[in-house]
């Protein structure tokens, strides 16, 4: 008894085997090129859930890193404005010391007071116009930075209002007594700004550490073999 094989069936079997072999080869090449064992759900239906979780974690970390970088830029903007105010206060202190001398005439003191008034206005202008991302920086509100991939990974940044009035700068230099009183007020304002700049510097350092930690977490997750 002889066995007869239909030519069409033989060709079909051969083509299917060739397609399967080609598909396996393509999958192997894809794994080599991507360095990943799982590139699609069919590669490992159970393992794909782990891949999705890891990818979500990495993408969340990437977003958190951008948020932290934005926070760093916000702090830089704030500190730049405080530095300007600090310079203005030092100039105001010079004017006040000059006005304390009785060698000044009444007109001299009026001229000194006029410059002082303009500097007070400039401090208020800086406080009201400094912004980041279209939002005011010195608004007295609490700003939240999402610095991690999970709920609760937030950093609170407490803002404050900044103006000549909030710094207590409301004295004139039309008399020696006024100038003498104002010197103490200005020194207090300078100390206030120094403390705010110190806090900004500490926050900037913390954000640096946060960004470094996020980068390390991303690298560690990327090394997980999937």
Spell out what each predicted region is.
Residues 1-224:
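Primary detection of the long, small/polar-rich alpha-helical "axial" segments characteristic
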């Amino acid at each position: 008894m002889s066995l007869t094989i239909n030519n069409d069936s033989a060709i079909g079997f051969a083509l299917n085997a060739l397609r399967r072999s080609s598909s396996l080869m393509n999958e192997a090449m894809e794994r080599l090129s991507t360095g990943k064992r799982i590139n699609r759900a069919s590669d490992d239906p159970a393992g794909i859930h782990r891949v999705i979780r890891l990818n979500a974690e990495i993408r969340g970390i990437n977003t958190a890193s951008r948020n932290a970088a934005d926070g760093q830029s916000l702090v830089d903007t704030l500190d730049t404005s405080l530095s300007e105010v600090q310079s203005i206060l030092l100039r105001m202190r010079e004017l006040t010391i000059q006005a304390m001398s009785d060698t000044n005439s009444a007109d001299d003191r009026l001229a000194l007071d006029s410059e002082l008034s303009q500097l007070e206005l400039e401090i208020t202008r800086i406080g009201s116009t400094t912004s980041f991302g279209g939002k005011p920086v010195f608004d007295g509100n609490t700003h939240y930075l999402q610095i991690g991939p999970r709920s609760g990974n937030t950093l609170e940044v407490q803002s404050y209002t900044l103006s000549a009035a909030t710094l207590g700068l409301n004295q004139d230099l039309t008399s020696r007594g006024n100038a003498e009183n104002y010197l103490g007020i200005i020194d207090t304002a300078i100390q206030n700004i120094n403390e705010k700049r110190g806090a900004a510097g500490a926050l900037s350092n913390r954000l640096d550490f946060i960004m470094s930690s996020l980068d390390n977490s991303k690298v560690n997750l990327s090394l997980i073999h999937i």
